[in-house]
């Protein structure tokens, strides 16, 4: 959507990109105190199922962060998929992965989950995360572990 493309432009500073003339929901940015609060919010916003979206992704900076969120979701009894460097398939539903393993994939909804730390790769990670979203993008920051 134009809203997601404009958000991605802001991350890179690149201007004058030709945008698709398809409007959608504004990008949502929020801060959370911990991962549990982030996961609660994701399940309020996720729209998966019949007459809704087919795919959603939680995208993180590192494999350790992705695997932690995946384990937390499994412990809650949620149906969730995990993509790591050994994965060979991408399934419908909710997927957890990293920004670099999400390259080349697209999801109806994307939930970017990033830590409140300075990292030279973080802007690039957020850009890749943003460009994976087809319809809705949520960028969440965890301020404490």
Feature roles, as predicted:
Residues 29-54:
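Conserved interdomain hinge at the start of the Helicase C-terminal
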Residues 1-5, 15, 47-145:
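Core RecA-like ATPase module of SF1/SF2 helicases and allied nucleic-acid translocases
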Residues 1-34:
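Conserved coupling/interface region of RecA-like P-loop/ASCE motor cores
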């Amino acid at each position: 959507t134009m809203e997601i493309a404009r958000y991605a432009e802001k991350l890179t500073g690149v201007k004058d990109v030709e945008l698709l003339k398809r409007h959608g929901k504004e990008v949502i940015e929020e801060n959370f105190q911990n991962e549990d609060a982030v996961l609660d919010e994701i399940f309020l916003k996720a729209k998966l199922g019949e007459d809704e979206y087919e795919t959603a992704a939680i995208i993180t900076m590192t494999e350790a962060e992705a695997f932690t969120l995946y384990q937390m979701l499994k412990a809650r009894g949620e149906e969730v998929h995990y993509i790591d460097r050994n994965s060979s398939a991408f399934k419908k539903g909710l997927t957890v992965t990293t920004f670099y393993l999400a390259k080349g994939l697209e999801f109806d909804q994307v939930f970017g989950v990033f830590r409140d730390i300075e990292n030279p790769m973080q802007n690039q990670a957020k850009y890749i995360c943003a460009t994976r979203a087809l319809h809705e993008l949520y960028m969440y920051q965890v301020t404490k572990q």
